[in-house]
């Protein structure tokens, strides 16, 4: 991706949290997203004193419905999260235009769309920032992890500052649990075992 900075973290939910935190939004400011999200994304919004606002899912793209997005935007709307649930990148230029016209930060969640593009431009390069997951079952997996892609220097400095003051190395026990879980997933999804359980038992 042609972005100036890539931060790596333990999860995508932390990536989302720290992007939001770096924006220094006011209590009660609104973050628009679709209702098909992991609970911790909503928790990240609430933990920062912000308000989640849900927008309908577009039937074709499974991303934000543009008409409902326009209806839900108001003076308190500060962030729009565009999640590409099925790997399909919608007409993100239209979403970006709506955000630009209303001084809203657009964050892309590209966890399911690595390598996807719109008009020959890669997903993750349209918004103010992009986040992604590297957890099991994702297109690219590193046992666990998440990342932030961003260009804005002020925000990069703010995120770096927050990392230095708030994050610490994980405990060995935690890493061991993650590795054991990933080993189980790898075994259960191996060709022989997966075929046995999915074909012969059903």
Mark where each language-model region is.
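Conserved N-terminal alpha-helix of the aminotransferase class I/II PLP-enzyme fold
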Residues: 1-14, 36
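Conserved PLP-anchoring active-site segment centered on the Schiff-base-forming lysine
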Residues: 19-72
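Active-site phosphate-binding strand-loop segment of PLP-dependent enzymes
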Residues: 60-161, 165, 169, 173
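Buried hydrophobic packing segments
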Residues: 15-20, 146
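A short beta-strand submotif of the Rossmann-like class I SAM-dependent methyltransferase core
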Residues: 8, 33, 82
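Short acidic capping loops at alpha-helix termini that bridge into adjacent secondary structure
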Residues: 4-5, 27-30, 76, 157
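Structural motif of enzymes handling amino- and sulfur-group chemistry
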Residues: 151-202
